[in-house]
Amino acid sequence: MFTLKKSLLLLFFLGTINLSLCEQERNAEEERRDEPDERNAEVEKRFFPIVGKLLFGLSGLLGK
């Protein structure tokens, strides 16, 4: 039982470190991206699929 606890603790610790490193890398990438054109492109990529899904869903509801 003690070995299992040590293994789980080690996995938790390594996962936490990995998550922290990924977050730092993502923050550094966001800081490097200071150009407004890139930000606008990212917003468009997020926004248009959502609008498309909503319109498709509404057309399906109205068609029935």
From Swiss-Prot:
InterPro entries: Frog_antimicrobial_propeptide. The keyword RNA-binding does not apply. GO terms for biological process: defense response to bacterium; defense response to fungus; innate immune response; killing of cells of another organism. Residues 1-22 form the signal peptide. The modification Leucine amide is found at residue 62. Residues 23-47 form a propeptide. Expressed by the skin glands. Keywords: Amidation, Amphibian defense peptide, Antibiotic, Antimicrobial, Cleavage on pair of basic residues, Fungicide, Immunity, Innate immunity, Secreted, Signal. One of its GO terms (cellular component) is extracellular region. It is found in: Secreted. Belongs to the frog skin active peptide (FSAP) family. Temporin subfamily. Antimicrobial peptide with activity against Gram-positive and Gram-negative bacteria and against fungi. Has been tested against S.aureus (MIC=1.25 ug/mL), B.pumilus (MIC=5.0 ug/mL), B.cereus (MIC=15.0 ug/mL), E.coli (MIC=1.25 ug/mL), B.dysenteriae (MIC=5.0 ug/mL), A.cacoaceticus (MIC=15.0 ug/mL), P.aeruginosa (MIC=5.0 ug/mL) and C.albicans (MIC=1.25 ug/mL). Also shows a weak hemolytic activity. This is Temporin-ALe.
